[in-house]
Structures are given as C-alpha cells and as structure tokens.
From Swiss-Prot:
Molecular-function annotations in GO: hydrolase activity
Entry's EC annotation: 3.1.1.-
Motif (Involved in the stabilization of the negatively charged intermediate by the formation of the oxyanion hole): 119-121
The protein's name: Arylacetamide deacetylase-like 4 family member 1
Cytoplasmic side: 1-4
One cellular component (GO) term of this entry: membrane
Source species, domain of life: Eukaryota
Gene name in the database record: Aadacl4fm1
PANTHER family reported for this sequence: AB HYDROLASE SUPERFAMILY PROTEIN C4A8.06C, ALPHA_BETA HYDROLASE FOLD-3 DOMAIN-CONTAINING PROTEIN
C-alpha cells in the first residue's frame, strides 16, 4: 500500500515537473521581448507565470476539477493585496450586481467627481479584487467617488450578460449621485481592456436617456473596440506579444460570444466578413487611417479572405455595436463626450484605438491621446507591484489621474 502511494506521489511530482519545464522551454526561453520594453528578464518571468497559470487551468478543466478562468481568478485574487490607504471602501449591490464603492476619507466642501469603472480581463479573468488597488489609487489621487462594477463573466455567463450588468449598474449609479455626494456634471466613465469596451458601449447606449445625467468624459485604457477584423498592422505584427496574444484573444472572443472554435481561422482571416459589411466598414477600418509610423513594416493582406457564408452566419453577431462599438454609425459617434484614449505600442489591439481616435476626431469629439511606446497589454495592473512594475505602468496611471483631475 505504501509502495502504491509512493508511486502515485512520484507520478504526480513528475507530471508537475514536466508541465512546468515544458512551459519554461515553450514560453520563457523562446519569447521575443520587444526592444523598447525595459527589464526583459522580468517580462519573461511574468509571461512564464501567466502561461503556467493558464496551462494548469486547462489541465484542471480537462480533469473536471474547475474551469481555467476559475483557477486563474482564484490565484489572481489570492495574490492580490488590497490597500485602502486614504479611501473608504464598501462592497454593495446595485440590484443583483456586485459593486465596490471607493470614497476618499478626507472631507470635501463640495460634491465630488464620480467615476464608473469597469475592469478588464477578456470576460474570462479579472475581478473587483484584481483591480482593487488601481481603483483605490484613482479615487484617492483624483479625489473622486469611484464605483467598480463586478459584472458577470465566463465560464458561466456569455454575451450580453457583461454589458447588461454594466449598463444597469451605470443607470443605478447615475440615478443615485446625490446619495454618494457626487456632482452630476462631473461623472467620468472609465474602463480597461474589455472594460474599456464596456465603457464605450454604456456611453453610446445612454446617449438617448433624458432621465439621467450625461457622462462628462470617457477614459478608455487600451480598450477592445471590435471583435471581427484582425488584419490591421498591430493585429498581424504583434500577434505573439504578451499578454494579449492572437490565440488568447480569439479564445476569449469565441468563448464569450459562444462561437465554435472551428470558425477561428475564418475569423482571423476575415472570411466571415460579408462583401456588403466590408463595403460599409472599410472606410473606418482601413490601415490607411492609421498613422504611417505605425505601419512602416506592415505587409497588407489581399483584403479579407474569400467570403465564407457559413462562417458569417455563425459569427455575424460579433459585428453588432454592443460588441464592436468602433463601427457605430457617425450620428452616434458625433454625440459622444470627450475622450481620453490610452494606446500601447506593443499591444495587438493598438490600431483599434488609433482607428477609434480618428473616428471621434472626424466627428468633432475632443480627444486626448496618450500613447505609450514601451507599453504592453495589461501593464497598468503592475503599477503597484514593486519588483514587477514597469515604467509604462506608472506612466499610464499618472496620465489618467492628471486628465481626470483637470475635468
């Protein structure tokens, strides 16, 4: 019996060691670190940890122990140290939606600015806890009342749960500003990654509402703005750069939109875009709209691949504006409030931010653009991680704070 137990333990240890060594060789040693990103060893370590977590998550998912997103979020939240220095924090519910309120402890002689915040994570990972310190920092440094929304996400919830939660929480918040001591003329909506997409969709959706205060400004931190066109320079040139690679991005999109993975290649090559849709969207998505310095080594594809009608029918909902707000009509874009856009040079979705910037500017919407040459997707969450922080992390949070304080 003891021999059997020892054999099983040895087998498990060898399995763990084998998986860890495989991830080390496959990711830590082979990754190409972009030249302008400082601390390449630190970057490799983070990349290794990210893929080690997702690999073990997939293994546990195959064993029916827990899903990959659950495992990732468990580790992410367990390792998150929550700091509340100078800020009162309280967990609440807006109906059934969990939210977290951040309010500066210092007294204020007048109503404060309000911030609605939506966290990132590709609808798979990320939580109120993972973004807690970022929200604390923003609330304290801008002297604002901030509400972070804990929307529903994978593995149990698919589109449109995320956006329904964000919209309903926003309406509840905007109707309750007086209770939180907020100036209704100074409400900012802010989001990171897919949370940035949520911020755009919420702002667009609430434009026609006359019973709630208008959003003062949008703060969009490398937002994911569309989910059907993957042929731009950054999508092709930065497809393997952490922490949002082509494979992880399309996995998140397919799972969230309940699209079968068999259509992945059709989506990535553009075969799912109908000729009529491309005729409408080309003027907004063309690489010609992107500044030349971002496409110097870009080799454009021969437009989208030959049209696949079956793929189109299975994926066409990815073009809806509640998923791809980048392609909303001009009459909607023209009504939007001013925006602060953060783009990252080494981000696969960099060009979507640049295209949205042009769309806003073409319709006369004031835009403040903050481009980070050494930035990579997700870097803002490292701003307080000391040993694992990067210059770009503090660069972004300080720029966001400066912009919000001037509103």
């Amino acid at each position: 019996m003891l021999y059997l137990v020892g054999f099983l333990l040895a087998t498990v240890c060898l399995l763990v060691l084998g998986v860890n060594v495989w991830v080390l060789i496959d990711h830590f040693l082979t990754i190409d670190v972009p030249p302008s990103i400082p601390h390449p060893v630190k970057f490799r370590i983070l990349h290794f940890c990210f893929h080690l977590t997702t690999t073990w998550g997939h293994i546990l998912e195959k064993m029916n122990i827990c899903s990959m997103p659950q495992f990732f979020c468990f580790l992410q939240d367990s390792l998150s140290s929550k700091e509340n220095h100078g800020v009162f924090v309280k967990d609440l519910r807006f109906g059934t939606i969990p939210v977290r309120l951040f309010r500066p402890k210092a007294a204020s002689s007048k109503p404060r600015r309000g911030i609605l915040f939506f966290h990132g994570g590709g609808a798979m990972i990320g939580s109120l806890d993972s973004h807690h310190n970022l929200c604390t920092f923003l609330a304290r440094e801008t002297d604002s009342v901030l509400v972070s929304v804990g929307y529903r996400k994978l593995p149990y919830y698919h589109h449109p749960s995320l956006y329904h939660d964000c919209i309903n929480a926003s309406i509840h918040f905007l109707k309750s500003l007086k209770a939180y001591g907020i100036d209704p003329s100074r409400v900012v909506i802010c989001g990171e990654s897919i949370g940035g997409a949520a911020a755009v969709v919420v702002t667009q959706t609430l434009l026609s509402r006359t019973d709630i205060p208008k959003i003062r400004a949008q703060v969009l931190i490398y937002p994911i703005l569309q989910a059907f066109y993957f042929q731009s320079p950054s999508h092709l040139m930065h497809k393997n750069i952490p922490f949002l690679t082509k494979d992880f991005m399309i996995t998140c999109i397919c799972k969230y939109l309940a699209i079968d993975f068999s259509w992945k290649d059709a989506m990535l090559t553009g075969a799912c875009i109908s000729p009529s849709a491309w005729k409408k969207y080309e003027k907004w998505l063309s690489p010609d709209n992107i500044p030349k310095r971002f496409r110097t080594t870009y080799q454009p594809p021969e437009s989208p691949a030959p049209f696949n009608e079956a793929a189109y029918l299975e994926t066409k909902h990815a073009m809806n504006i509640d998923i791809s707000p980048l392609v909303a009509d001009d009459k909607i874009i023209a009504q939007l409030p001013e925006a602060f856009l953060v783009s990252l040079h080494w981000d696969i979705i960099r060009d979507d931010v640049l295209l949205y910037k042009k769309r806003l500017e073409d319709q006369g919407v004031p835009v403040t653009w903050h481009h980070v040459e050494d930035g990579f997707h997700g870097c803002i969450l490292l701003f307080d991680k000391k040993l694992f922080s990067f210059p770009c992390s503090l660069n972004i949070v300080n720029a966001v704070v400066s912009y919000i304080k001037d509103l």
